[in-house]
A protein has these predicted regions:
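Active-site proximal loops enriched in glycine and acidic residues that flank catalytic Cys/His/Asp
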Residues: 93, 191-192, 223-226, 258-261, ...
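Hydrophobic/aromatic ligand-binding patch that stacks against planar heteroaromatic rings
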Residues: 211, 246, 275
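Conserved thiamine diphosphate
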Residues: 242-268, 310, 315-320
Length: 320
């Protein structure tokens, strides 16, 4: 784990973050059951993608292969959030990994997801005009006796366009919950590395994040940094060292973490949730991973990134 927090001007926030990262009692530590639940989520995530790859060969699904640690980290945000008073989590994300999140986090039935693959819909109301990796869902999850409502917002193909929608929904929900402290409803936005650095709407949302009329009490951002945007390498996609550098405009702390260490990713998710609930400010997790297959499952990535994909082919999965 690498942390960027020295750009924060508030000494209280800076001290909290330093102690949260460096104090011995705050170090990475999981109980046996905690480790098992992380492993369980990784098995679910990887098995889901492998099943789809075998059953629906070459069909677009925009799998999370290589970034499976996203699933246990989202689970941790909901679990820790529930302990800290969160009643509702609003999630916005692109198509990469969406089906996995629907199945393994929101517990959308496998039957409905597979029906969407074969084009068999049970009713005319089933959003039949849209592709399966644009659809949202909502469900209730219970952890440690805390019931948390999770909803994943529908989105178009336009990357990051869902961000202001999620923030607006969050703000509205806080109004209806009479959530003046902005502790009961939290937004979680998941991004790709190229889109986070490249799309102007990201900067616009940061610019409005502290304004009285638009503030949602802080967003947890997770960048699924697979080090490639369609076929574009990072050095051709941005001028800054990290995709997360845009977040420094609002002095958001940034956690860089290796996605092949799922315990570290979950630890970062815990820190991010605690920071957001304590200081009501944005926080960013830069989850550095890779994309095992092409941009979609019909692409051959080694045409444009031969050396990268030679290494990826030899690289074991997170589970292995």
């Amino acid at each position: 784990i690498g942390a960027e927090y020295m750009h924060i001007s508030d000494p209280v926030e800076k001290k909290w973050f330093r102690e949260r990262m460096e104090k011995k009692e705050n170090q990475l530590h999981f109980t046996s059951s905690g480790k098992k639940s992380i492993l369980n989520k990784l098995i679910q995530a990887e098995s889901f993608e492998k099943f789809l790859a075998v059953k629906f060969v070459g069909t677009k699904r925009f799998g999370i292969d290589g970034g499976e640690s996203l699933i246990p980290s989202l689970e941790q945000i909901i679990k820790r959030g529930g302990q800290l008073g969160v009643k509702e989590v609003k999630i916005g994300m692109p198509h990469r990994g969406r089906l996995n999140v629907l199945a393994n986090l929101l517990q959308k039935s496998y039957k409905r997801i597979f029906n969407e693959f074969v084009g068999d819909y049970s009713s005319a109301k089933d959003s039949t005009g849209d592709v399966k990796y644009h659809l949202g869902a909502s469900s209730n999850r219970e952890f440690d006796g805390n019931l948390v409502h999770i909803s994943l917002t529908d989105n178009p193909s336009h990357l990051e366009a869902v961000n202001p929608v999620v923030l607006g929904q969050t703000r509205a929900k806080q109004f209806f919950h009479k959530d003046i402290k902005r502790q009961k409803v939290i937004p979680v936005l998941i991004h790709g590395d190229a889109a986070f650095a490249g799309q102007g709407v990201v900067a616009e949302c940061f610019a409005m994040s502290g304004l009285k009329g638009h503030n949602t009490g802080g967003t947890i951002h997770i960048i699924v940094n697979n080090q490639i945007g369609f076929t574009t390498s990072p050095r051709f996609a941005r001028s800054s060292p990290y995709p997360s550098d845009i977040a420094k405009m609002v002095e958001a702390p940034i956690l860089h973490v290796n996605a092949d260490d799922p315990e570290a990713v979950v630890h970062c998710a815990r820190i991010a949730t605690e920071f957001r609930q304590k200081f009501n400010r944005d926080v960013v997790i830069d989850m550095i991973c890779y994309r095992r297959f092409g941009h979609n499952e019909g692409d051959e990535p080694s045409f444009t990134q031969p050396m990268m994909y030679e290494k990826i082919r030899q690289h074991p999965t997170t589970l292995n």
